[in-house]
Amino acid sequence: MWGAKNKMKKIRTLSRLLKIQKTLIHYQLDEFISDIPALHSLRWIFYLSPNLWFRKTTSSSRGERLRCALEDLGPLYVKFGQSLSTRPDLLPEDIAIELSKLQDDVPAFSADLVEQEILKAFGQPAMDIFKEFDSNAFASASIAQAHLATLKSGEEVIVKILRPNIWEAIEKDMEILILCAKLINNYSEELKRLRPIEVVSDYQATVLHELDLVREAANCAQIGRNWERSDIIKVPEIYWDYCKTNILVQERIHGVPINNIKELKAAGVNIEQLAINGVRIFFTQVFLHNLFHADMH
């Protein structure tokens, strides 16, 4: 029985590897391998594929092609792209700009799937739980998407819902990342010093934690308690009666995105003081609270 399971696992891994190879070739991303000397030993992965011989060229920029490939490959790769987008100091400008679109511009899953996830979590449809519920997402990311709603008691809330079947998708792709890390570790002396296997293992632990929205709700509630007497930050309230492993419901707060300088100035916000407050908040979380929000965009 165990032999059959291992065989199926290997077949599944091979199938996924071929899908990744096909996607990278389709978007002409094999050029990234050619441009990075440390990865030259892995070029054979592309040269052996018939997909390389018959592909059509595209006029899209390399940044756009990379972003589209990550979106096609699924949530784990989108998450990786999001992580890269927060380090524009390490990336060419054109790539950094495109990857930044992954922060909140990932295609949403359908309204029908949203209703199914709510029914599965609560045992009843959305309109029996909320006074109002918009089944069309207003924001969508790699792991989950957000919906506007109103509780029966009148409070405006944000409903965050995990992508369907994301656990299975993440598990499959983690197997691939671990395999790739082992390949890099074995075939590139230059990249081996970066400890790719350990990096992927840490990344795996981080992503799996993000899949538990009850854990996220608990962290948010703790941050709220840490700042409950502050006049420079407002942390949304968590509505625990509505929180599940795959669903988080929190207070909706109206505001201006911190990167919208024009609108902030129009609202009379002191930009310099805002920056000072942001630094103060972050360092207070890190050095005093030992619990910080690591996704402050």
Where in the sequence are the language-model features?
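Glycine-rich ATP phosphate-binding loop
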Residues: 148, 155-163
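N-terminal accessory/targeting segments that precede structured cores
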Residues: 2-145, 168-196
